[in-house]
């Protein structure tokens, strides 16, 4: 899986997944923290642990788009390009700069990554990705700033994993990803 290769590259270790979960590392060698962010590689791993069944959210923000993979219990829930389209006062706006990390935070409860991108006409988008490890939920949000009042239309798409169904809440923007088997 892509997130395993990213973990190996970022951590510089051959021990990942089941090896770390089983504690097979050399005695006295500390198991690395499960979540990890590398600014220069523009990669983030938000994860609950090293077991193959633990939840993993891998974020690649190289270039002008974001790739996101989400895994839980060994199953891919989401995976691929996070496609967006934004319109301000009916006019489509495009990115003028690449994504930049503006905040990385990780403690025993959550992993949080915030990315910023500048769009046409000085519009800025802040993308928030938060994984709550204990409660096992993923929060994804885009915030827009433009300096003046305007109408905004913003849509995004994330490819679902095999047999995963998106069940949106009718009155809010909350959703559940459900095993369609």
How would you describe each model-predicted region?
Residues 2-180:
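Catalytic and substrate-binding regions of extracellular carbohydrate-active enzymes
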């Amino acid at each position: 899986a892509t997130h395993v290769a990213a973990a190996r590259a970022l951590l510089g270790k051959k021990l990942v997944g089941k090896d770390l979960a089983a504690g097979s590392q050399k005695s006295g060698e500390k198991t690395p923290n499960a979540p990890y962010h590398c600014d220069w590689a523009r990669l983030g791993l938000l994860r609950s642990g090293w077991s193959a069944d633990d939840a993993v959210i891998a974020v690649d923000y190289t270039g002008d788009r974001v790739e996101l993979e989400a895994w839980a219990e060994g199953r891919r829930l989401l995976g691929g390009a996070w496609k967006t389209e934004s319109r301000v006062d009916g006019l489509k706006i495009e990115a003028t700069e690449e994504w930049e990390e503006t905040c990385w935070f990780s403690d025993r409860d959550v992993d949080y990554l915030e990315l910023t991108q500048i769009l046409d006409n000085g519009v800025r988008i802040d993308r928030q990705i938060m994984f709550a490890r204990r409660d096992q939920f993923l929060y994804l949000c885009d915030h827009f700033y433009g300096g003046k009042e305007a109408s905004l239309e913003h849509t995004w798409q994330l490819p679902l994993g095999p047999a995963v169904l998106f069940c949106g809440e009718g009155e809010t923007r909350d959703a559940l990803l459900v095993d369609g088997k």
